[in-house]
């Protein structure tokens, strides 16, 4: 067998008849499959053992030779070679066709490749192939032209007139003759000549023909091979036939299709031998052609061949296509051994890196390991008895199992795996029961909850796999989210509530103002009921083991609460003592105002102080981020476990309950509603008098009700007791938000109808009072729409992720520095006056392109190619610098990937990115994963002339597919001053712009809102009206970089509006893939074809060679491709074929004789090679291990050291 890791590239081409015969082990002559009585394959049939190999290992068909000792013997009685039955998966056969047939892929595709080569229309071809018309193959000395079509009558007339003076034929034979006569050299030269003068349609056609001709010429494929003389038969194990219970047989559709071909082929042979009339032979040939068409691609032409129950049969093409096809079902996603799945339950007492594995599941997963160990320990004599022991569940196997799984990580995966945190490694601990135990903190990353979710377990087998799982995938290593570098393991729900309750402060609580000598004394007093968790007390600061206190502070008293003392015990000693939820306290030190002299009257001091807010979810997140920055992974994961345990413990002690009595109603609600009703009445009167339009009335009514709801909400918040359990839950960020509470205790407010329009009748009741029937009915609209939207959004978002992954899967960090001298100038992204993404966030973790100096002091803040840390970014912004040039993926020169410097920091680890990191896939996941959170709906902007501005998921798709946006803005093609804005007829406006050497006017429809006024200075490509710019128009007016900047800003706007943060670099990687191609306009002296779509790198290299040899380089214009188009235009045909339009991609690749260099990830997964990313990248695979020096024998026991 072929060693999969040892080949460089894969090539695809057309097969010549001789090639097909050379693959074959014999000709299939009969349509029979197996004998139903003996269940043995029929000889020369579709399952023949002589052709395809024996059914049983080392046994011939007649049984004369049995056993492995006859290996390689060919039986003299039945002609079957004695070998393994596995050969039935790889041996092919063939069918010698009695008449040539055309291959439907090349004749039917769009554009028809056969049509282009022969310069005939697909309609004409169809008439010839399916025996409706004759075609002249040799005109001889007649007035007929070659390739002219003749009807039956015309043919007869010319035959009588000229006799044998010309030859014409029909069917694939005639096509084959014409194809064989084509002189590719001559045709290409003629086409190149024609191109010099041709225009319009003729030029396009010539370019397309030239492309196909060149493809045939360069690949060495012969055009006549598009017509088949021999048909290959695929190995029988790939189209199996199995016996069902009850003696019936189930068979692959391919066998039916092959049977039809063989039957018709044999019948045609017989008719030809008998010398049957022409019309009968022609009909049989047409039927053979149709049978072969159905075998190759059933349903492509005419009605598909159907099996029982009118179901179309699955042909060879269908075997490859779609989600259930060979590519996506078996090559890119396989079922694997050493895996299992079960329901998950919470494991609150696990460590961050552990998971609980049910005993019986662990036993099954680690069976071979346990068997080996049983034999190794002498508990079983051989593997067989070890296996028997395991099956009987003998008591001694459990100790062995524990030993085996110790330090052997397993992978846990929850579907849908939207980003790389959907698969993480854990160390298993054995648990009773049949459910997997999962650590509560990793739930956010998996998006898991315990309402019946299931998870899959996989066992990494090899030492390398275990090492990678432990070092890279262990849950304790994956604390940061790759999309924005923020911690993803923040506590939630009970943990948040517990820590919130712990850090609450209460006035006049039991024991307020008591002074304690140390933490232990305070805890003792708390346990005995002398003080409360929330009591504000004083503790001698010197007794607190915090390294941040100054010597002065150690002599003083620290004002804090018992709860905060306990909370601070979970933090590292050198972390500031956290007494208030402020940035200063977290990052620098405990504010000095909390330290008082020992002589102070503590009670009076405390009584005079304001209460401090407790620690909410966001603060806990900030604490984790801060601990991570200062102490790195190990300490952070330990601290997280302590925070989790403390949270659960205290929330249990707090004993939060929710009852209907906790929902207090608002006294003033009635007055507010009365007032709103009056206002609405007034508005309606104004409308009746004709003072306002219906639209204005609607807008105002909605405004009134929204204001009323907000007022009720505001009053509710004020009237609430801070210790109200519902308030605590939502204030801490554990569950729910203020709008939920308003609906419970205030009013539900306005609802939307199915079209998304707001119904102007508000729901004035709340859930505490109960809704009227009408109110309940109105509210069902919104509820139902919410559910359907969610279901649709999930599918859309998943498909978006798939396309993103496909377009960027080969973007890998390939080198340390690409040495580019270009960069991207960035400033804060704004929408109007609102800052969407501040400069600081855009700078952090990037490399500077130029030296950055302070504008006033001229002191160097960062040198060229320095990494901009958070501190430097803050310095830059504080210095008042508004734009900075940084290294960016947009300007990276690395071929097939990005370099370290242009990419910047790896957000998932907070350190420099490694060579081999698959940043393309990470980018695709980071953009696709939050897709489900984006809303589906297109918002109606207020105002009479409100255009629909697409937002949310549809807008993201619009950007990445480079479609013409809805609500398109008009852009200017010249830069200059707006000299006039005049109103034309139909209330249109005309804007005139005076450039330096050009003057342009634009007509603006009256519904559009202007962004400019007279006297404004505009740049080329700037939008004159509100709306989205069409990036394809922008690329015509401006350069590539400004299009890239625009797309980046637009994507960020959509995500940030929804409160989702994504690192710029991910969007940069994706956008760069959309602008990789260039359309050649003028070929110069190069041998590139005009109109070709080329990779920018290939184009530049071709031009460099041309300039070096002193000839004229080609010119081209950059093209913006949507992600689907860009994935299909990739150089790798394997990757493109496994994405979409499989047959088209393969047809094209076969004609061009394409080579797939296996640079991306998908191609290698399809072939079963190691992916060229991470430790599989070339530079790591080629490392050889060498012994540096032998170490001396270690005699000390480890415990003694």
From Swiss-Prot:
GO terms for molecular function: DNA binding; DNA-directed RNA polymerase activity; magnesium ion binding; zinc ion binding. Zn(2+) 2 binds at residues 818, 892, 899, 902. It catalyses: RNA(n) + a ribonucleoside 5'-triphosphate = RNA(n+1) + diphosphate. It is an enzyme of class 2 (transferase). One of its GO terms (biological process) is DNA-templated transcription. Pfam families: RNA_pol_Rpb1_1, RNA_pol_Rpb1_2, RNA_pol_Rpb1_3, RNA_pol_Rpb1_4, RNA_pol_Rpb1_5. Mg(2+) binds at residues 449, 451, 453. Its cofactor is Mg(2+); Zn(2+). The keyword Metal-binding applies. SUPFAM superfamilies: beta and beta-prime subunits of DNA dependent RNA-polymerase. One of its GO terms (cellular component) is DNA-directed RNA polymerase complex. Its EC number is 2.7.7.6. Binds 1 Mg(2+) ion per subunit. Zn(2+) 1 binds at residues 60, 62, 75, 78. Keywords: DNA-directed RNA polymerase, Magnesium, Metal-binding, Nucleotidyltransferase, Transcription, Transferase, Zinc. Belongs to the RNA polymerase beta' chain family. DNA-dependent RNA polymerase catalyzes the transcription of DNA into RNA using the four ribonucleoside triphosphates as substrates. PANTHER family: DNA-DIRECTED RNA POLYMERASE, DNA-DIRECTED RNA POLYMERASE SUBUNIT BETA. The RNAP catalytic core consists of 2 alpha, 1 beta, 1 beta' and 1 omega subunit. When a sigma factor is associated with the core the holoenzyme is formed, which can initiate transcription. This is DNA-directed RNA polymerase subunit beta'. It comes from Listeria innocua serovar 6a (strain ATCC BAA-680 / CLIP 11262). The lineage of its organism: Bacteria, Bacillati, Bacillota, Bacilli, Bacillales.
């Amino acid at each position: 067998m072929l060693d999969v890791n040892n080949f460089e590239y894969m090539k695809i081409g057309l097969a010549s008849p001789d090639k097909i015969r050379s693959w074959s082990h014999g000709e299939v002559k009969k349509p029979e499959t197996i004998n139903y009585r003996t269940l043995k394959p029929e000889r020369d049939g579709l399952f023949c053992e002589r052709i395809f190999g024996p059914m049983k290992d080392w046994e011939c068909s007649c049984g004369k030779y049995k056993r492995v000792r006859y290996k390689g013997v060919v039986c003299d009685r039945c002609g079957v070679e004695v070998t393994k039955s596995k050969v039935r998966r790889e041996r092919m056969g063939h069918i010698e066709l009695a008449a040539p047939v055309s291959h439907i892929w090349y004749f039917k595709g769009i554009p028809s490749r056969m049509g282009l080569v022969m310069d005939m229309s697909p309609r004409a071809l169809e008439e010839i192939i399916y025996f409706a018309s004759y075609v002249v193959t040799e005109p001889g000395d007649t007035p007929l032209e070659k390739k002219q079509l003749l009807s039956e009558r015309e043919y007869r007339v010319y035959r009588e007139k000229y006799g044998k003076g010309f030859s014409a034929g029909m069917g694939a034979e005639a096509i084959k003759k014409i194809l064989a006569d084509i002189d590719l050299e001559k045709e290409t030269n003629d086409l190149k000549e024609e191109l010099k003068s041709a225009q319009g349609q003729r030029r396009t056609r010539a370019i397309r023909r030239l492309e196909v001709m060149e493809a045939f010429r360069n690949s060495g494929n012969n055009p006549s091979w598009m017509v088949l003389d021999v048909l290959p038969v695929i190995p029988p194990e790939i189209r199996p036939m199995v016996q069902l219970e009850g003696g019936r047989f189930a068979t692959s559709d391919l066998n039916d299709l092959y049977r039809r071909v063989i039957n018709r082929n044999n019948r045609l042979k017989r008719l030809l031998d008998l010398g049957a009339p022409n019309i009968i032979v022609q009909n049989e040939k047409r039927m053979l052609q149709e049978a072969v068409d159905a075998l190759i691609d059933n349903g492509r032409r005419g009605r598909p061949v159907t099996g029982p129950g009118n179901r179309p049969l699955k042909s060879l093409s269908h075997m490859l296509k779609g989600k259930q096809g060979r590519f996506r079902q078996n090559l890119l996603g396989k079922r694997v051994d050493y895996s299992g799945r079960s329901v998950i339950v919470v494991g609150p007492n696990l460590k961050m890196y552990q998971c609980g594995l049910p005993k019986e599941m662990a036993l099954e997963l680690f069976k071979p390991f346990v068997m080996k160990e049983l034999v190794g320990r002498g508990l079983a004599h051989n593997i067989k008895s070890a296996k028997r022991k395991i099956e009987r569940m003998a008591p001694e196997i459990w100790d062995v199992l524990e030993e085996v799984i110790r330090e052997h990580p397993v992978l846990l995966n929850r579907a849908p795996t939207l980003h790389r945190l959907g698969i993480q490694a854990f160390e298993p601990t054995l648990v009773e029961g049949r459910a997997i135990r999962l650590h509560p903190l990793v739930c956010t990353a998996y998006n898991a909850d315990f309402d019946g979710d299931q998870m899959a377990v996989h066992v990494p087998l090899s030492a390398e796999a275990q090492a990678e799982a432990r070092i890279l995938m262990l849950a304790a290593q994956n604390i940061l989210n790759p999309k924005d570098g923020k911690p993803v393991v923040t506590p939630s729900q009970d943990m948040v509530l517990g820590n919130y309750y712990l850090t609450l402060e209460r006035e006049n609580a039991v024991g307020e103002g008591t002074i304690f000598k140390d933490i232990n004394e305070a805890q003792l007093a708390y346990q005995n009921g002398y003080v409360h968790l929330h009591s504000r007390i004083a503790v001698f600061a010197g007794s607190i083991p915090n390294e941040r206190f100054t010597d002065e502070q150690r002599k003083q008293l620290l004002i804090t609460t018992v709860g905060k003392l306990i909370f601070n015990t979970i933090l590292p000693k050198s972390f500031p003592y956290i007494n208030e939820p402020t940035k200063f306290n977290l990052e620098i030190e405990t504010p000095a105002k909390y330290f008082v002299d020992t002589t102070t009257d503590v009670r009076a001091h405390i009584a005079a102080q304001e209460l401090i807010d407790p620690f909410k979810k966001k603060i806990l997140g900030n604490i984790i981020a801060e601990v991570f920055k200062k102490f790195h992974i190990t300490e952070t994961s330990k601290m997280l476990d302590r925070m989790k345990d403390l949270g659960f413990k205290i929330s249990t002690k707090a004993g939060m309950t929710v009852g209907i009595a906790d929902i207090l109603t608002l006294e003033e609600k009635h007055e507010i509603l009365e007032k709103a009703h009056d206002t609405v009445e007034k508005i309606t009167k104004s409308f009746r008098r004709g003072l306002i339009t219906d639209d204005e009335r609607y807008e105002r009514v909605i405004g009134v009700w929204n204001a009323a709801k907000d007022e009720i909400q505001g009053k509710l918040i004020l009237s609430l007791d801070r210790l109200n359990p519902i308030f605590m839950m939502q204030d801490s960020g554990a569950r729910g938000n203020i709008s939920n509470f308003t609906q419970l205790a205030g009013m539900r407010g306005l609802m939307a109808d199915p079209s998304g329009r707001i119904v102007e009748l508000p729901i004035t009741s709340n859930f505490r009072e109960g809704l009227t029937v009408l109110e309940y009915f109105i509210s069902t609209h919104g509820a139902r729409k919410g559910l359907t939207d969610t279901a649709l959004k999930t599918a859309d978002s998943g498909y978006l992720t798939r396309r993103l992954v496909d377009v960027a899967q080969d973007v890998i960090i390939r080198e340390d520095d690409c040495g580019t001298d270009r960069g991207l100038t960035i400033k804060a992204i704004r929408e109007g006056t609102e800052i969407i993404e501040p400069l600081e966030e855009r700078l952090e973790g990037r490399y500077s392109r130029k030296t950055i100096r302070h504008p006033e002091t001229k002191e160097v803040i960062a040198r060229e190619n320095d990494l901009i840390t958070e501190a430097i970014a803050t310095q830059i912004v504080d210095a008042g610098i508004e734009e900075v040039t940084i290294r960016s993926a947009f300007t990276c020169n690395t071929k097939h990937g990005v370099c370290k410097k242009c990419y910047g920091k790896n957000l998932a680890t907070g350190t420099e990115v490694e060579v081999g990191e698959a940043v393309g896939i990470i980018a695709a996941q980071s953009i696709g994963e939050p897709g489900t959170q984006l809303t589906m709906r297109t918002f109606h902007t207020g105002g009479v002339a409100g255009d629909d501005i697409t937002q949310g998921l549809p807008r993201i798709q619009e950007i990445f597919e480079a479609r013409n946006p809805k609500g398109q803005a008009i852009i200017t093609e010249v830069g200059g001053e707006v000299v006039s804005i005049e109103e034309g007829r139909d209330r249109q406006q005309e804007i005139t712009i005076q450039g330096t050497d050009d003057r342009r006017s634009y007509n603006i429809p009256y519904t559009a809102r202007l962004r400019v006024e007279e006297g404004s200075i505009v740049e080329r490509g700037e939008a004159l009206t509100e709306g989205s710019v069409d990036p394809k128009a922008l690329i015509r007016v401006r350069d590539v970089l400004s299009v890239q900047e625009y797309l980046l800003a637009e994507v960020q706007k959509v995500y940030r509006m929804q409160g989702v943060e994504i690192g710029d670099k991910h969007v940069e990687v994706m956008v760069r893939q959309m602008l990789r191609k260039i359309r050649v306009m003028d070929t110069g002296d190069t041998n590139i074809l005009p109109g070709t779509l080329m990779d920018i790198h290939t184009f530049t290299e071709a031009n460099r060679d041309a300039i070096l040899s002193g000839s004229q380089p080609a010119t081209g214009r950059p093209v913006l491709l949507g992600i689907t188009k860009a994935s299909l235009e990739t150089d790798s045909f394997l990757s493109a074929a496994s994405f979409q339009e499989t047959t088209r991609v393969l047809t094209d690749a076969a004609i061009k004789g394409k080579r797939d260099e296996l640079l991306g990830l998908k191609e290698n997964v399809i072939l079963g090679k190691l992916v060229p990313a991470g430790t599989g990248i070339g530079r790591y695979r080629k490392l050889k291990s060498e012994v540096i020096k032998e170490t001396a024998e270690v005699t000390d026991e480890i415990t003694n050291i």
